[in-house]
């Protein structure tokens, strides 16, 4: 049986926190900033956490990630 490989696209987008949660960046941060309020842009700068519904699926893609 071959080894399970880490999904390289997911590995570039998610990082594990010290407590084992998954950290992610927000979407909507590449362009069209004139249409966004200052408050919205400020909130997008902070990292978010993966939601509970997505956690299991993403964790399987990152199985071998330290």
Curated annotation (Swiss-Prot):
Domain of life: Bacteria
Compositional bias per record (Basic residues), positions renumbered to this chain: 1-24
Keyword Ribonucleoprotein attached: yes
Renumbered residue ranges of the record's region Disordered: 1-26
GO cellular component terms attached to this protein's record: cytosolic large ribosomal subunit
InterPro entries: Ribosomal_bL35, Ribosomal_bL35-like, Ribosomal_bL35_CS, Ribosomal_bL35_sf
Keyword GTP-binding: no
GO molecular function, one term: structural constituent of ribosome
GO biological process: translation
Keywords noted in UniProt: Ribonucleoprotein, Ribosomal protein
Pfam families found in the cross-reference section: Ribosomal_L35p
Family listed: Belongs to the bacterial ribosomal protein bL35 family.
The protein, known as: Large ribosomal subunit protein bL35
Organism for this UniProt entry: Bacillus cytotoxicus (strain DSM 22905 / CIP 110041 / 391-98 / NVH 391-98)
Gene of this entry: rpmI
């Amino acid at each position: 049986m071959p080894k399970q490989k880490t999904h390289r696209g997911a590995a570039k987008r998610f990082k594990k926190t010290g407590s084992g949660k998954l950290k992610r960046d927000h979407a909507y941060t590449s362009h069209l900033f004139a249409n966004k309020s200052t408050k919205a842009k400020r909130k997008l700068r902070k990292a978010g956490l993966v939601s509970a519904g997505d956690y299991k699926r993403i964790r399987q893609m990152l199985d071998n990630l330290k």
